[in-house]
Amino acid sequence: MFRIQLRTMSSKTCKSDYPKEFVSFLNSSHSPYHTVHNIKKHLVSNGFKELSERDSWAGHVAQKGKYFVTRNGSSIIAFAVGGKWEPGNPIAITGAHTDSPALRIKPISKRVSEKYLQVGVETYGGAIWHSWFDKDLGVAGRVFVKDAKTGKSIARLVDLNRPLLKIPTLAIHLDRDVNQKFEFNRETQLLPIGGLQEDKTEAKTEKEINNGEFTSIKTIVQRHHAELLGLIAKELAIDTIEDIEDFELILYDHNASTLGGFNDEFVFSGRLDNLTSCFTSMHGLTLAADTEIDRESGIRLMACFDHEEIGSSSAQGADSNFLPNILERLSILKGDGSDQTKPLFHSAILETSAKSFFLSSDVAHAVHPNYANKYESQHKPLLGGGPVIKINANQRYMTNSPGLVLVKRLAEAAKVPLQLFVVANDSPCGSTIGPILASKTGIRTLDLGNPVLSMHSIRETGGSADLEFQIKLFKEFFERYTSIESEIVV
């Protein structure tokens, strides 16, 4: 008799609610601005209060308090202050980044070719650009709108969550070698179509822009298709497209993020690099924010930066003064919420830096079953196998033995499996925000991250079980770091 043995749920499948919540997070975080907005909502729902860099924090930040601050709407730092915090005490820090490789709409995007309305785009980061062809593309980001009553420019988030644009490939009949080598010009052939030109389109546009007023640069209607502007205006419920002053918009795969695989062991989505770490560090902090906070002598802090994919050198990137400035403010904060005096402050920030630890979290390369020879033979991370500790002798990653011992202890206490990764000697190695912040602050640092396949594709693959593993690890790190940091000193 022929029998079929049904498999039980795979051990690599996560039984928690985190995978479904992560998918929802991904589907509402199509730009760094939306990502930070969603992190803010989660923090506020867990009792965190917003601060501003423009204000003094004296009297506003106190022991047992929970706070967050944003910069540019695309980077965010959140922290919980221990009940026994004093200047000079340690800070447990996790770091991630909010950006991903993408196509960004150019300042003057209006293009027309062969009666097609096209949108000029600029490549951002090092994506696998061929993966963007033949995808239904949505548009999301930040729009500045003029308030008719006050005259102020107001930033609004917009997500045109519909199949709006497409970059079509050339038919195989016209390119017989396409399956041997797919080549294209990123300036002229990585250009999406958005509609068909009508004879009245140009006349309508000229009428709208010919109002006789002086403008320092081309008007918004001269720079972008009125059809695109009209969709933005409708989404934001504003009266006229002329109220749109400028925008920062990126394209994304409209195909929704989802769980997949025989047992939902996979997450199929864009932007896993690095919204994975944003999501897990966010949950790790909020889960630990109130745990024995009365007895906590340190601060528990998470940072999510913009612009990692292009080197981090911006006002809101990891190479900026954003984190150092926050550490500076916290290092002059006395237990009663007032500020320290200058001489004490200088010593305190040095002591805090020496005692603190930074977990730089960015996704890692999972072993690819079809290209296993591309990996170092003894370091092949598996999806569902837990967070990956990344090591590089040339300091592309910051992991060293003291840090590894520390994280190993935390993982064992939290029952979290870990994996190790180094690149093969004949392969290039990427990097993270870890080396940038380690050299900038002198804070001890370790690089780790959850494994993914197809990194920098428009559609990546992660492991659903790894989400809970990393959240548990971060929670353990926040809760226990100050009690064990003195045990591993070099």
Swiss-Prot record:
InterPro entries: Peptidase_M18, Peptidase_M18_dom2. Pfam families: Peptidase_M18. It catalyses: Release of an N-terminal aspartate or glutamate from a peptide, with a preference for aspartate. Aspartyl aminopeptidase that contributes to peptide degradation both in the cytosol and the vacuole. Cells may respond to environmental conditions by changing the distributions of the cytosolic enzyme to the vacuole when cells need more active vacuolar degradation. Belongs to the peptidase M18 family. Present with 172 molecules/cell in log phase SD medium. This is Aspartyl aminopeptidase 4. The gene is APE4.
